[in-house]
Amino acid sequence: MGKLTILFLVAAALLSTQVMVQGDGDQPADRDAVPRDDNPAGTIEKFMNLLRQVRCRWTPVCG
């Protein structure tokens, strides 16, 4: 029974080490990054993106 307990503890330690090494992909630089500007063309592009998101039915604008 003692050998089984030791084997279980070693397996748990190896798994936890593997999880710590692999991580979740969240790098410290990602947390502090400035959000990317999705609308570099300015206000009109923001408006057009909003119309596209709400499935604009105005043909001259949304095409």
UniProtKB/Swiss-Prot annotation:
The keyword Disulfide bond applies. Residues 1-23 form the signal peptide. Expressed by the venom duct. Keywords: Amidation, D-amino acid, Disulfide bond, Lipid-binding, Neurotoxin, Secreted, Signal, Toxin. Residues 24-55 form a propeptide. It is found in: Secreted. D-chirality of Trp-58 ('Trp-3' in the mature Contryphan-Vc2 peptide) seems to be only protective against proteolytic degradation, since [L-Trp3]-contryphan-Vc2 is degraded by trypsin within 4 hours, while [D-Trp3]-contryphan-Vc2 is not affected and the toxicity of both [D-Trp3]- and [L-Trp3]-contryphan-Vc2 is similar when intractranially injected into mice. It is also noteworthy that neither [D-Trp3]- nor [L-Trp3]-contryphan-Vc2 is susceptible to cleavage by pepsin or alpha-chymotrypsin over the 4 hours duration of the assay. The record marks W58 as: Key residue for activity. The modification Cysteine amide is found at C62. The keyword Disulfide bond applies. GO terms for molecular function: ion channel inhibitor activity; lipid binding; toxin activity. Disulfide bonds join C56-C62. GO terms for cellular component: extracellular region. The modification D-tryptophan is found at W58. Exists in two forms, due to cis-trans isomerization at 59-Thr-Pro-60. The trans conformation is the major form, with a cis:trans ratio of 1:5. The cysteine framework is C-C. Belongs to the O2 superfamily. Contryphan family. Its target is unknown, but this toxin may modulate voltage-activated calcium channels (Cav) or calcium-dependent potassium channels (KCa). This is Contryphan-Vc2. It comes from Conus victoriae. The lineage of its organism: Eukaryota, Metazoa, Spiralia, Lophotrochozoa, Mollusca.
